[in-house]
């Protein structure tokens, strides 16, 4: 289901056109009433009304294995969601999620604390779980923990360590990771195994060093496909 259309390329976003809440609800109903998804990934939801509609329809259809990428703050620190919309997301969507995947700035907001080192990533994950009752994958950045992420599921914590790949084309890495986690959950893997497999996939996609566009381009999602174009 599409929450908003964007006009963008590798150099930046030129415009965002949000769907109406009613049309979003129709999209969700159309999917669940025909080919029920085994997992759901939620990304950018740009308004309070759209957050509320998303939560209402997912509750109605008793959606399972929900992966929520909050998309509240960019890794640069820029706010991507209004404070009022974020409050509705915390109240309505967070409790429905199996796992939420905040970056460091988002985890700081959700946990109400600063994160400067790996022990604080662990503490923030526990605080978020205590507030919302969902598993938490705090995504590290090289300013805190290189490419290491911390998962807390309410019972135990687990580090997923990765090697930082010096690739400037990282557009969509957070969205890719959360989508890959949902895909692996849909295939029947545990949350821990889904995170591990998804991080491996993301690392391989980045390692291909795809170079498209004049700005920060995407990674190579189709790296496993081989062959050449016809001349």
Segments and roles (model prediction):
Residues 108-109, 167-191:
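Short, small-residue alpha-helix embedded
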Residues 192-231:
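Charged C-terminal helix
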Residues 83-157:
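Conserved phosphate/ATP/ADP-binding segment of small-molecule kinases
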Residues 12-18, 78-83, 112-116, 166:
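Short glycine-enriched, charge-decorated loop/helix-capping segments at active-site entrances
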Residues 1-75, 79, 227:
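Conserved N-terminal subdomain of the carbohydrate kinase-like
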């Amino acid at each position: 289901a599409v929450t908003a259309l964007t006009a963008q390329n590798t150099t930046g976003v030129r415009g965002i056109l949000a769907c109406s809440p009613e049309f979003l609800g129709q999209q969700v109903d159309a999917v669940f009433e025909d080919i029920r998804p085994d997992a759901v990934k939620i990304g950018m939801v740009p308004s309070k009304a759209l957050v509320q509609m998303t939560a209402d329809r997912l509750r109605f259809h008793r959606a399972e294995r929900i992966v929520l990428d909050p998309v509240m703050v960019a890794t640069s620190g820029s706010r991507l969601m209004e404070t009022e919309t974020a409050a509705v997301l915390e109240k309505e969507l967070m409790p429905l999620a199996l796992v939420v995947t905040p970056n460091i700035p988002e985890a700081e907001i959700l946990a109400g604390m600063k994160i400067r080192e790996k022990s604080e990533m662990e503490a923030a994950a526990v605080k978020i779980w205590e507030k919302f009752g969902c598993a938490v994958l705090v995504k590290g950045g090289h300013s805190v923990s290189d490419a290491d992420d911390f998962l807390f599921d309410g019972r135990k914590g687990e580090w997923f360590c990765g090697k930082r790949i010096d690739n400037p084309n990282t557009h969509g890495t957070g969205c890719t990771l959360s989508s890959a986690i949902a895909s692996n959950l849909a295939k029947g893997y545990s949350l821990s195994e889904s995170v591990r497999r998804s991080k491996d996939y993301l690392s391989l996609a980045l390692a291909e060093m795809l170079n498209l566009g004049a700005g920060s381009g995407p990674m190579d999602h189709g790296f496993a496909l081989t062959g050449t174009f016809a001349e």
